[in-house]
Amino acid sequence: TAEEDEAYSYTTTATDMDTGDTVTLTCTTVPSWLTCTAGALTGTPTNSDVGSHAVVITATDAAGATATDSFTIVVSNANDAPTVTSTAVTSATEDAVYTYTLTATDADVGDTLTFSGTTVPSWLTFTASTGVLTGTPTNDNVGTTGNAVVLTVTDAAGESVTDSFTITVANTNDAPSFSSTPVTTAQEDDVYTYTAVGTDM
């Protein structure tokens, strides 16, 4: 037996009843993830090697007589953490819709992945079922302050990976506005006064 991502080693030994006879060990059948040197097997199986692998090692004496050591190595699966495959969108523009879709894969066939928004700015909404992060930043969100994002992908075994990034929101020029209230009435022969006050975001 062997386990995915764990080093495997096995050394075949052979003897001959004929005193002083030389025995040569040859690897006849060996899976690709193993290296065989004079009957010594070493290697580390990966996720793609999970399953059964036949091995045949042949012992040959000086007279050409042979014997075989045949067995099967069963590589058991070890859970692999998910991998984020999407590239985060790290820039946004004030008053424009921002969208980023998180995607991920897992080397374990059939593994179920769950998305969650661990840290999400107030102007954004993360939908776990689709992996979509979207929202529209305002003038208050310009820059990077408060725009850190951490999204988490978790597999069925509880292994997780995070997609962490900061969004930089670019400013869009805002038109000025009046903050004063006009005086809309006046009295004959009385001085009329109104001071207009304007602001800009």
Regions picked out by a protein language model, each given a short descriptive name:
Residues 2-4, 18, 22, 29-78, ...:
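Acidic, turn/loop-rich segments in luminal/extracellular domains of secretory-pathway
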Residues 79-87, 173-181:
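Proline-enriched interdomain boundary motifs that mark the N-terminal boundary
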Residues 11-15, 101-105, 195-199:
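Short edge beta-strand/loop segments characteristic of extracellular beta-sandwich folds
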Residues 8:
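Single, function-defining residue in the core of a domain
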